[in-house]
Structure formats: C-alpha cells, structure tokens
C-alpha cells in the first residue's frame, strides 16, 4: 500500500494505491471523526456539497471512500457505489461556525447514510 496525504486545499484527506500480484487499485479517501458510536444512531451525516466535491475530485481510475472513525468502531462507505435511493436527504440545520456558541444556523442539504450501507466496519481497540 502506498499512501499520499492530500494538500490542505484538497476535497479529501488522502489517496492510496493498493497493489496485489495482478493489479493495482486506487482510492480517494475522506476521513470523518465522530464522538458518538453507532449505538446512538443508525445513520451518518454527509453534507451534499461535500459528497459532490469528493466525487468530482475522484479520478476515473479511483474509487471514492469515506471512513467514519468513532470511539469504538470504524464504518467505511464506498461513495462511488452508493445507492442514493436508499439515502435520506434533508435540509439539516448546521451552525455556520461549528464550534462557536454564537454562530448562526444555516439550513444545509445533508445526506444521512444508513450504517447498513457500509461496505465494511470494525471494532476499534
């Protein structure tokens, strides 16, 4: 595996190449950390604009993935193969500045991806 960190202005966090005996696979990956585990909810949020940015920054020979890293588990979704008919889309009320108490609320188109759509998950140790 060869891992490349993306520049700060990039839409994703890293790219990596996985090499086997007969081929190479290329991946464009976004990492999201969450303070709560899947026992508290059955979906993970992803802003629609972020989803579009990730797909637009993914090269033709790459697959786009998003990793949700939670306190006790990791959930991985293949955004290149995500069935949008099974994803809930809502105008979610989000603070314009995430960690500010005085921030105004903005209605933001957000996808809520069911955890059951993950292509892989594991328990963190």
Residue ranges and their predicted role:
Residues 66:
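Anionic-ligand binding patches
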Residues 1-20:
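A short acidic/basic microdomain associated with nuclease active sites
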Residues 9-11, 24-28, 59-61:
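Short connector loops at helix/strand junctions that flank enzyme active sites
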Residues 34-58:
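Mg2+/Mn2+-dependent nuclease catalytic core
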Residues 12, 60-62, 90, 101:
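Intrinsic-disorder/low-complexity regions
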Residues 17-23, 70-125:
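Non-catalytic C-terminal interaction segments of nucleic acid-processing enzymes
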Residues 8, 32-34, 71:
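An acidic- and aromatic-residue-enriched active-site/binding cleft used to recognize and process polar
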Residues 14-37:
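Conserved catalytic cores of phosphodiester-cleaving nucleases, focusing on short active-site segments
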């Amino acid at each position: 595996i060869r891992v490349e960190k993306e520049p700060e202005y990039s839409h994703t966090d890293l790219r990596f190449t996985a090499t086997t005996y007969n081929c190479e696979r290329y991946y464009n990956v976004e990492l999201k950390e969450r303070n709560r585990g899947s026992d508290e909810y059955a979906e993970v949020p992803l802003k629609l604009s972020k989803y579009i940015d990730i797909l637009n920054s993914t090269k033709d020979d790459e697959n786009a993935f998003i990793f949700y890293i939670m306190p006790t588990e990791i959930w991985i979704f293949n955004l290149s193969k995500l069935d949008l008919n099974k994803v809930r889309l809502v105008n979610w009320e989000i603070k314009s500045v995430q960690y500010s108490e005085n921030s105004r609320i903005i209605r933001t188109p957000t996808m809520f991806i069911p955890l059951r759509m993950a292509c892989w998950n594991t328990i963190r140790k």
